């Protein structure tokens, strides 16, 4: 049984939440988000708190209701604070620049990689070797960061590539003569 799911999600002031069937809608100062909860999970809004319970006593329902509670908590946090991911670029000649709605990455290929920024995501480049991704939906922010990182993941010998801030890269030793 999930311990995460037992705790209700408190809806802070300035945020409105509504539950219609299996859809949870949350509206706050930064925007509006919605999430469709799985059919094996019951969702209720009572006294400014969203509670999540398994509908059946099956292993699947018990596994899903902790996930559903975490998703609803992410909706509330997203519309109040938002989410941010930071990426670092390491390597000679590796850099990032913003061009309108596109992020242009020079990652050692014969061509520059152009990434189109999706709706609801704001990307800033404070330095040519740093990328900040900000948005209200944690899944979209994480997906954008993972897609940008996948263009040139860090390699274990020199550590060159795109990595998350404070990510540990397991380094290997080169060949011995």
From Swiss-Prot:
Main function: This protein binds to the 23S rRNA, and is important in its secondary structure. It is located near the subunit interface in the base of the L7/L12 stalk, and near the tRNA binding site of the peptidyltransferase center.
Gene3D superfamilies xref list: Ribosomal protein L6, alpha-beta domain
UniProt name for this protein: Large ribosomal subunit protein uL6
GO molecular function annotations of the record: rRNA binding; structural constituent of ribosome
SUPFAM superfamilies for the chain: Ribosomal protein L6
Annotated HAMAP family: Ribosomal_uL6_B
Family stated for the protein in its record: Belongs to the universal ribosomal protein uL6 family.
Superkingdom assignment: Bacteria
Keywords: Ribonucleoprotein, Ribosomal protein, RNA-binding, rRNA-binding
Pfam families recorded: Ribosomal_L6 (PF00347)
NCBIfam families in UniProt: L6_bact (TIGR03654)
Gene Ontology CC terms, in alphabetical order: cytosolic large ribosomal subunit
Gene it is expressed from: rplF
